[in-house]
Amino acid sequence: MDHPSREKDERQRTTKPMAQRREHCSRPSGSTSSGVLMVGPNFRVGKKIGCGNFGELRLGKNLYTNEYVAIKLEPIKSRAPQLHLEYRFYKQLGSAGEGLPQVYYFGPCGKYNAMVLELLGPSLEDLFDLCDRTFTLKTVLMIAIQLLSRMEYVHSKNLIYRDVKPENFLIGRQGNKKEHVIHIIDFGLAKEYIDPETKKHIPYREHKSLTGTARYMSINTHLGKEQSRRDDLEALGHMFMYFLRGSLPWQGLKADTLKERYQKIGDTKRNTPIEVLCENFPEEMATYLRYVRRLDFFEKPDYEYLRTLFTDLFERKGYTFDYAYDWVGRPIPTPVGSVHVDSGASAITRESHTHRDRPSQQPLRNQTASSERRGEWEIQPSRQTNTSYLTSHLAADRHGGSVQVVSSTNGELNVDDPTGAHSNAPITAHAEVEVVEEAKCCCFFKRKRKKTTQRHK
């Protein structure tokens, strides 16, 4: 009489583990039975290499190709979800444009959304530090010519960028054929300026909430005007002068409140004549700023005219476009020391969220900057998420000490997050790659066997 009961118990004991295994195999992302966190079928999540308002940035590895990747994790229950929108913009941009990171995967990972992207090199801000915070005219022109093409491509896909700053422009990884290419990253603040339904330009509006980084944003953005293509180009012009001068006249302003300081930045920017800003530099720099500031809200910029301004100046100076940037030949810091570069190659808030003057508690990244630079503060109204997946702007805007006014509560990941127990789990390194725990920049790695690279023409 007891045999049927024993057989039933035995079936229950054997079928339960099998059901659990089927559940695990059908799960697209999450922790495996060995405790390894996976994103999608083939991306293994490793140590934490950065964090920001969006959540965490993790080092990852493609188990099929042994290539390292960057993985952004955002809580699914975030009050201001951002990652899927950024992924959609990357898909809208496509893979045809030069200087855009590859996006490998987007999907759930336990309690988080995850986006897997190409791992790139250091940012222009990192390299600016390396070059004693001044770039030569040749380097700035090589950067400017490339970034005008990047922005033209972004605009051709019906997007405006709205987040110009040196931290968002990265070179490729050392030893990679794209190491000389300036990449544009982080489309968390981008916006469609062509209505996808009507195919018409968005209307001109005023009293808009501020979007961008105060140091570089256009004058019209300070005035609360809706941004369009012209504002991206003006912000680029301010960044070019930052590289040439080493600083901008509206840095380091004093005020009692963040709101007043932000107002002072805009006032100083408006009251600084272009001739003064560009004094002692080629006239083409002033011509560029005059042109972009005179553009109409709806007007399509003449990108070729602006590029020709710089290419003609480049040729008149007798420069060769050999990608011999100022940082070439300098030891570039990596997570495992320095790599000597072969001389042969080389935010704010969305409109739907209210602005709150609450500074971020994130530390400044660069601990070696001068005390004067550390003492400078700018208001950087918060974006929904701090969406850089590679390097510098995971923390507050460095050197200038920009304060992020946070309007979302994403914060860091909870202590009980599924990756927390495995953040230090080693990733089996390729023979040529080493990874250490304390990484100043998460975008590049020291190669043990130095590969010779040819100069890119």
From Swiss-Prot:
Entries under InterPro entries matching the protein: Casein_kinase-1_gamma_C, CK1_Ser-Thr_kinase, Kinase-like_dom_sf, Prot_kinase_dom, Protein_kinase_ATP_BS, Ser/Thr_kinase_AS
Annotated ranges, domain Protein kinase: 43-314
Superkingdom, taxonomy of origin: Eukaryota
Active site: D163
One annotated Gene Ontology cellular component of this protein: cytoplasm
Modified residues (Phosphoserine): S343
A single GO BP: signal transduction
Compositionally skewed regions (Basic and acidic residues) per UniProt: 1-13, 350-359
Cellular compartments annotated: Cytoplasm
Principal cellular location given in the protein's record: cytoplasm
Segments for region (Disordered): 1-36, 350-384
Residue spans of biased composition, Polar residues class: 360-370
Post-translational modification: Autophosphorylated.
Enzymatic reactions: L-seryl-[protein] + ATP = O-phospho-L-seryl-[protein] + ADP + H(+); L-threonyl-[protein] + ATP = O-phospho-L-threonyl-[protein] + ADP + H(+)
EC number: 2.7.11.1
Keyword ATP-binding on entry: yes
GO molecular-function terms, A-Z: ATP binding; protein serine kinase activity; protein serine/threonine kinase activity
Entry binding sites for ATP: I49, G50, C51, G52, N53, F54, G55, E56, L57, K72
CDD domains in alphabetical order: STKc_CK1_gamma
Alphabetical keyword list: ATP-binding, Cytoplasm, Kinase, Nucleotide-binding, Phosphoprotein, Serine/threonine-protein kinase, Transferase, Wnt signaling pathway
PANTHER family: CASEIN KINASE-RELATED (PTHR11909)
Subunit (UniProt): Monomer.
Function: Serine/threonine-protein kinase. Casein kinases are operationally defined by their preferential utilization of acidic proteins such as caseins as substrates. It can phosphorylate a large number of proteins. Participates in Wnt signaling. Regulates fast synaptic transmission mediated by glutamate. Phosphorylates CLSPN.
Entry similarity comment: Belongs to the protein kinase superfamily. CK1 Ser/Thr protein kinase family. Casein kinase I subfamily.
Protein name: Casein kinase I isoform gamma-1
Organism in which the protein naturally occurs: Bos taurus (Bovine)
